[in-house]
Amino acid sequence: MDKQQGELRQRLTPEQYAVTQEAATERPFSGEYDNFYQEGIYVDVVSGQALFSSRDKYDAGCGWPSFTKPIDQTNLNEHRDESFGMHRTEVTSTQANSHLGHVFPDGPRDRGGLRYCINSAALKFIPVADLEKAGYGQYQSLFK
C-alpha cells in the first residue's frame, strides 16, 4: 500500500474507503444522504471537489441519493462499467478519481432525463449557511 492510500485509510471510514477507492456500493436505503433534503452542496469526501447541488437532488426511490445533473459536468468522469454482467456508466470525480456511483438515462425527462445515483459514503454535505466559511462561497449563487 502506498503512502497516499494509507493516509486515506486513516482519514476515511471503512465504508467511505471501500466505496471511493474500491468501487464498492453501499446498501440501498442505508446512506446518510438518501432521505436528506437540506439546502447546500455535496462534495467529494476524498478531495472536497464540488459535485452536486441540493437543488438538483430528487427522490428516485432507488435507495441512494439521486441528482439530475452535477454542478459542473467537467468535475465528473464517466466510464463503461460491465461488472456483475450489467451495462452501466460509472461516475468518478476528476480530482481524486473517487468512485461515486453510476448515471442512468431514467431520470425526470423535464430535468434532462438523467439520474446520477450516488453513494452517500462518497459525499460530504456543506450546508448553504457554511459555504463561505468552508471555502465554497462561489456556489452561494446556486441558492438565490
From Swiss-Prot:
Sorted UniProt keywords? Oxidoreductase
The residue ranges flagged as biased composition, category Basic and acidic residues, are 1-12
GO biological process: what's one of them?
A: protein repair
Any one GO MF annotation of this record: peptide-methionine (R)-S-oxide reductase activity
- Give the span(s) annotated as Disordered: 1-25
PROSITE patterns documented for this protein: MSRB (PS51790)
Q: Known EC number(s)?
A: 1.8.4.12
The record's Gene Ontology cellular component field reads:
cytoplasm
What broad class of enzyme is this? Answer: oxidoreductase
**Reaction(s) the record says it catalyses:** L-methionyl-[protein] + [thioredoxin]-disulfide + H2O = L-methionyl-(R)-S-oxide-[protein] + [thioredoxin]-dithiol
TM stretches of this protein: none
Q: Which residues form the active site?
A: C117
Question: Where in this chain does the record put each MsrB domain?
Answer: 5-128
Give the NCBIfam families listed for this entry: peptide-methionine (R)-S-oxide reductase MsrB
Tell me which family the UniProt entry assigns to this protein: Belongs to the MsrB Met sulfoxide reductase family.
Q: Which protein are we looking at?
A: Peptide methionine sulfoxide reductase MsrB
The gene name reads: msrB
